[in-house]
Amino acid sequence: MKILIPTAKEMNTDLPSIEATPLKPESQAVLDALALYSASQLESFYKVSAEKATEEFQNIQALKRQTAQHYPALKLFDGLMYRNIKRDKLTEAEQDYLENHVFITSALYGVVPALSPMAPHRLDFLMKLKVAGKTLKSHWKAVYDEALKKEEVIFSLLSSEFETVFSKEIRAKMVTFKFMEDRGGQLKIHSTISKKARGAFLTALIENQVQTVGEARRLNFAGFVYREDLSQPQGLVFVKEV
């Protein structure tokens, strides 16, 4: 069983660095394509300020020169979902579960264990980078599929932009999750609720060592409970009354 989570734009580098591992050929090809952009070209590519583009240019060039600082990916990313994941003071069993079951899907690194070394970078599958004439999704599809082909159960906490990198055969094995708030009988869903809830849900999976869909259905976390009436066999819905 594997649990898939996306990367995040926000990062925290105020951490002890760890040793880098060599880039896969597929990752190196993406990096080589990114490294062709000047700082001013990155400004329009990323749709960011000149200052931010310069920072990203320096990150890319540091990776290219193999001088970039690397950090455990789960701790480097610091978006709303990540800030709601239990990342410190894990028991030995929780640490083992995290290492064996939780994987991050990255447009630069591929599908990798959550504590893999990553350097600060900005890239997702909505960005129009061409790698040897292919889109990022086409470039990664075979590698993404290979990472999961032996899995019977895949818990996806990904957005559709990441899920669609995988083939239909792999996506057919995915269990997806939706998190909603019940405000006086009105069911609400928005990105802030979803991101926080994904982090809290992953924490509950880790703490309870969940291995099956049945075990996931029984979880109560951060006020969320499973709603069978709203769910599908491979699309679980959790609702929090507020």
Swiss-Prot record:
BP term (GO), one: response to hydroperoxide
Organism: Streptococcus pneumoniae (strain CGSP14)
Alphabetical list of InterPro entries matching this protein: YaaA
Lineage, top ranks: Bacteria, Bacillati, Bacillota, Bacilli, Lactobacillales
Superkingdom, taxonomy of origin: Bacteria
Protein name per Swiss-Prot or TrEMBL: UPF0246 protein SPCG_1533
Family: Belongs to the UPF0246 family.
Gene Ontology cellular component list: cytosol
